[in-house]
């Protein structure tokens, strides 16, 4: 089975082998050296002053960021299930929250966000996804973050980059917390998340003492000494060490980002050549999202007959979206096979006669023929 879901993504052999190493104890000097190396690489990757690793899914990092940085009121963008989650986190902690709702295919707009900030002067934290993976939508987070800081530099900007980190370069000048997750571009199983922090965010965290398991003040103190407050995600840390080695072998992050972009753009062009429609108005490079009334049938047929697993949508698009992953290090022939299988499935359902258009278009675009 070829797994092409946008999280958890397929774990290649090189990454799987990192989990077969003898288990080190997390309170040893040997592990501390690995932990330090991984954190330093993550700092370079994100461009922020500090990076904290947490034993949790990405939702844990979202919660930790909100409770640590928001003292008064929260503003968040809801353009899908993961944007909605910021509001649920705020509610669980009795934080007053202001919601900006957008259609799942529509990126957030700067003007609407600035108007909400001006109308609610107690807002001191703003949350948004870089990529809202419910529909594969890329928000203009860099532009939004800059506008917020120019309007009110005291507002903390929290960006869920779980499906953007490791996919494309992110401009983080105006970002205070950048959230990542292990099961996306890092090609690891779920259960580890990270938060990259600006100096402003670090100062806020050190002033406060909130939470227990997600107490970032405690984690800052310990992780600066290359350890963790509680049990570290040991094998995930070893996996990250291997991930950075693989990226280096590819030629570094610039080469990885360029490769991901080539595959994403070629996939989008192939999908359009098949007469299908791309769902978001501003597509992310992390996935190609197709909207079709036949999405459920196509997805099931692809899995059962062609051994290719794409992701469907979530409510209210459960049966009308197909999401094709581009995150991680994916051999180009696998992407070509997956798109060819999609065209074959269209033929099987009498939706389009097979003529090899998907592969032809994909490979021509990828190799710029």
Swiss-Prot record:
Q: Which InterPro entries has this protein been placed in?
A: Aminotrans_V_dom (IPR000192), PyrdxlP-dep_Trfase (IPR015424), PyrdxlP-dep_Trfase_major (IPR015421), PyrdxlP-dep_Trfase_small (IPR015422), SP_NH2Trfase/AEP_transaminase (IPR024169)
| Signal peptide positions on this chain | none
A UniProt-annotated Pfam family = Aminotran_5
> What Enzyme Commission number does this protein have?
2.6.1.-
Q: Which UniProt keywords apply?
A: Aminotransferase, Pyridoxal phosphate, Transferase
Instruction: List the cofactors.
Output: pyridoxal 5'-phosphate
Give residue numbers for the modification (N6-(pyridoxal phosphate)lysine): 184
Q: Name one GO molecular function term.
A: transaminase activity
Q: Which family does it belong to?
A: Belongs to the class-V pyridoxal-phosphate-dependent aminotransferase family.
Per its record, how is this protein called by name? Uncharacterized aminotransferase jhp_0673
Which species expresses this protein natively? Helicobacter pylori (strain J99 / ATCC 700824) (Campylobacter pylori J99)
């Amino acid at each position: 089975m070829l797994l092409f879901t946008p999280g958890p993504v397929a774990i290649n052999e090189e990454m799987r082998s990192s989990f077969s190493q003898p288990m080190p104890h997390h309170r040893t000097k040997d592990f501390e050296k690995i932990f330090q190396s991984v954190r330093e690489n993550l700092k370079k990757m994100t461009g922020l002053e500090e990076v904290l690793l947490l034993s949790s899914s990405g939702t844990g990092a979202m919660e930790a960021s909100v409770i640590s940085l928001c003292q008064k009121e929260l503003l968040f963008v809801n353009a899908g299930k993961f944007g909605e989650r910021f509001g649920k986190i705020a509610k669980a902690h009795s934080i007053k929250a202001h919601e900006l709702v957008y259609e799942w295919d529509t990126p957030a707009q700067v003007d609407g966000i600035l108007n909400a900030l001006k109308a609610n002067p107690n807002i001191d934290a703003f949350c948004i996804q870089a990529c809202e993976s419910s529909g594969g939508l890329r928000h203009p987070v860099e532009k939004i973050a800059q506008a917020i800081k120019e309007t009110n530099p005291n507002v903390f900007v929290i960006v869920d980059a779980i499906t953007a980190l490791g996919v494309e370069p992110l401009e983080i000048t105006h970002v205070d917390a950048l959230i990542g997750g292990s099961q996306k571009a890092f090609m690891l199983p779920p259960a580890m998340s990270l938060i990259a922090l600006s100096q402003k965010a670090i100062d806020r965290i050190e002033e406060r003492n909130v939470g227990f398991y997600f107490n970032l003040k405690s984690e800052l103190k310990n992780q600066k000494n290359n350890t963790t407050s509680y049990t570290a995600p040991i094998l995930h840390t070893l996996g990250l060490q291997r991930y950075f080695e693989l990226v280096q072998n590819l030629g570094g992050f610039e080469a990885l980002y360029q490769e991901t972009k080539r595959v994403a753009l070629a996939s989008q062009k192939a999908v359009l050549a098949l007469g299908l429609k791309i769902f978001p108005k501003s597509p992310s490079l992390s996935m190609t999202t197709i909207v079709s009334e036949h999405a459920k049938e196509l997805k099931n047929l692809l899995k059962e007959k062609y051994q290719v697993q794409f992701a469907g949508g979530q409510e209210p698009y459960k049966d009308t979206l197909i999401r094709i992953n581009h995150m991680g290090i994916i051999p180009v022939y696998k992407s070509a096979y997956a798109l060819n299988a999609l065209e074959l499935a269209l033929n099987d359902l009498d939706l389009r006669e097979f003529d090899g258009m998907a592969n032809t278009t994909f490979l021509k675009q990828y190799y710029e023929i």
